[in-house]
Amino acid sequence: LLAQRGAGSDQAGLWEFPGGKVEAGESQPEALARELDEELGICARIGNYVGSNQWQQGERLIRLHAWQVAEFSGELQQRCHSALVWVTPQQAQEYALAPADVPLLAEYIAAQGDSR
């Protein structure tokens, strides 16, 4: 699932993997489940760890940690993104991804190739 950042947001128009910030006392999977509920209105069971990336965005250092969603319930809602789209990992390469997400997609695709 890719989510397009809204017009008033940082990196507006770029596509990203949904998620958000880890709050104090949360694990990464707990934070992702909470953020998916807040942003998309779904209840997600978080699966396997995919990888991590750091990206310098101006003065900010962005640290991303990607996890698979094993399953979810509920209907997707566009609460803070301008669009949502289901794509294969290969199709995702054709979208204008936020720069910090690009290495995570490449890592996921490489890992899938190794497991086949």
Stretches found by the model and what they are:
Residues C43-A44, S52-L76, V85, Y108:
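Active-site-adjacent beta-strand/loop module that shapes the phosphate/pyrophosphate-binding cleft
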